[in-house]
């Protein structure tokens, strides 16, 4: 790029998504639109950006992620639809393929999804240039070239291809739909999934994963999607558990449980896990998001040069999903999967200029991210033998995911700024390496508890049948007197031991069955099912027993609609439009803006969901909000403060939060909803279809939680009512305050009635308890309540002692204050007296001074004389000594000044004492309120203790009756066993005789079998000897055949024809012989041939007889039941010998013919 075009880059928009510079002319655009395939070396490896840029003479860009010339496509999306040019088989990038004309569309080769290897899905998201970067003069160094390419502005030859590249204007909803939705859907089907964001600090990782009010992140969208899938899946039951942890300075902390610090990583057959991590069962999106918000409160954050609120730790939000078929005739398969949503801390360079603790945190963050990069490099290398998972806690926890067990989606967040060009390049290299990791996603299935129960039931039935068969067999055998008393006793002991063992095994199986049934019943209430399966049953009026816990559309309505994120014109629907201008903080104050950002960041995931609810106190004025929150009761919990965000403000900083609160009609038409009210309404709605496996204790626990929530809301409304009453006393003519007071009173009465209804339901549940197991649980609950009662009593005693001490201190201060008031009054009287005396003395002095003035003729001379007296005291002392009256006046004036100072000091002390007494009065009133509340709670606990003691007495009576019944049944069982023992001894004797007979028969059978086996072994040895002889004779015959060949090679003289045994011989024509051969010579040759034929015939007959013998032996062996002999081997030997003899005879005939 020429230097003349660089000055124009200062005006580049931060939302720029592709290079549009005209300096390069048409060649640059063509290169960007049609990048050529990658250049490969001789070994077929893809070229790096540096090598490709140095090798390309014309500056043609290459793709680093491309493979060899005839190999795989450049992008993972091309694994499913690969584009090839007609001239060569080289793959092209999706940008080049999309830019081709429609008429020249290349052929598409479909790849079977079952056989294709699946890789990690890697996406890149650009954030826009920040105002700080724009003010600093940064330029766009990296940009998105199409939907799958990232290019460098200064070196177009450096380009990377990924599954998807998101520009700066892309919404988080769009990122979730492409990068994370398939992972969430797979997790709901039993496939483990992991989604994590990677990038440098201040690149937008936390914004992508958590989001804000206007644009929710991946985690809240995934939570919404999970519950939406459950709602759309009426055929399955789901159980959801969540855990939330952070890795801070290589230490694992539990964010849901602040006590869980420095946890350890363990490993079992299923993979790695964190020991002692807290898991919460969630029932709704609100519940899950509230847990995330509470976990964010404990996460470590800090500030650096790039970000005011920077994440200083890695966080892992794990959602464990269990699902099973909801039908009764299911196969018992349970799918178990984990969805890990990870927000990594950003890598830091020296540009952050951190010191002290921040530098230490950055070193740990860089170390873990470096280990993650090393592990990914080792995984993609293919030659590495050791992968350093244990070098970092992060890679240790990600070992199962990086090993390929589940789906992984990597979202790399990058900044296009030129000042971070090197960091962005490193992030792209990391993403490029991660793309080559292969994964094998498969469903995780476990055996359901119901199937285990069926298995145990079948096994118990089989054991009982075996026991019955054993007893029937012992009863069926005849009686034979025992031959030996010792054998009888030993057999009896063995049978008793076997019976005891069998009985204990049956008891263990029954206990295991009962434990599993109890676990199933306790977990039934935590199972989530869709409400779509119960529509028809609700219409017909029949209660569905399969419905555990369901959530409706009102729960999902709190979350923003998916379609809202696709359009940028729906800002009027967003929550920011509901905030008034007065509620915004002053951006000029950096401290308040920092606190505002931090508060918004922590509540960002719940703010957009909670603010959808209309506030029950939206009609309150600004002064009421500020006063009620500034002096709220300290007994309110943090959860109650989170439920009412309008009451969380201090000093009136936030005014009216919604525009709906300004209109009283809207306030009346949309009454406020609270969490406790929702729970109460849900409990009242579900009263007719309680779950079949829910125990009384679980119901009581749920009702107690609802009562606690309602009590907190009642306390909050009472505090607001108190503030409004004070305002009404000051402004009795304000009708709006009176209406609000009436509303609050009605709401308090309604909540109290709800509390009474819940307490009545708890009492009814306790009265209808008849199950012994539930009674045992009630006794345990009673012991816990008694312990809590003792603790509360102790705390109350401590509070009363503190109250007495405070009252004593208050009385002492009041007495001191009274003494000080008396002292002040006395001092005032003394001051008045002194002032009166001083006035009198002044009058006397004036009278004395009037006498010399009358003697003087001129007043001016008298004034000059007085002035001279005042200027020259020595002169006055010489003329006249100072009178004692004037000295007294001066002393009294000094004393008056001291008294004035003492008066001011005493006034200040009085004000301080009044303030202190006021504080003590407030503390005393607060202590009285606490004492009253404690007295009420103590009264309730006493009533509950009396009720539980009554129940305990009932249980003790039932237990005594059960013990008496058990004792009587044991006595009857002992008598019956004594009667059965006599019969059992006779049965044992019979069984002993029958076992002796069976042993004798078995010994005879074994001896006969041993003899037969010995005989068979002898026969086999004989057969082997025969086989050896046959082999020797066969060798002799081959020698004979060789001799015959030598004799017949000289001349073909004779031909023989054998009429017996199928042999033929004839004399050959003697026309070719010499005319001088005599007949005697012919006779001699004829004799030799006849003798050779006779020998061959004899040998053949011998071999034929032996073959018949072997056939007879084989047939006899086949007729016998001999499992130890190999009949096939004997038949193969027989066939071999027959073939050998036939070949010998054929050779003989052929030689004779020749």
From Swiss-Prot:
Region of interest (Disordered), ranges: 1-109, 620-674, 838-885
Molecular function GO terms recorded: ATP binding; ATP hydrolysis activity; microtubule binding; microtubule motor activity
Chain sites annotated for binding ATP: 199-206
PROSITE patterns per record: KINESIN_MOTOR_1 (PS00411), KINESIN_MOTOR_2 (PS50067)
Domain Kinesin motor: 119-437
InterPro entries registered for this protein in UniProt: Kinesin-like_fam, Kinesin_motor_CS, Kinesin_motor_dom, Kinesin_motor_dom_sf, P-loop_NTPase
Residue ranges that the Swiss-Prot or TrEMBL entry lists as coiled coil: 441-523, 734-761, 801-845, 894-967
Biased composition (Low complexity): 1-14, 29-109, 628-640, 846-857
GO biological process: microtubule-based movement
Location(s) in or outside the cell: Plastid, Chloroplast
Cellular component annotations (GO), alphabetically ordered: chloroplast; cytoplasm; kinesin complex; microtubule
Alphabetically ordered keywords of this record: ATP-binding, Chloroplast, Coiled coil, Microtubule, Motor protein, Nucleotide-binding, Plastid, Transit peptide
Organelle transit peptide: 1-21
Family: Belongs to the TRAFAC class myosin-kinesin ATPase superfamily. Kinesin family. KIN-7 subfamily.
Protein name: Kinesin-like protein KIN-7E, chloroplastic
This protein's encoding gene: KIN7E
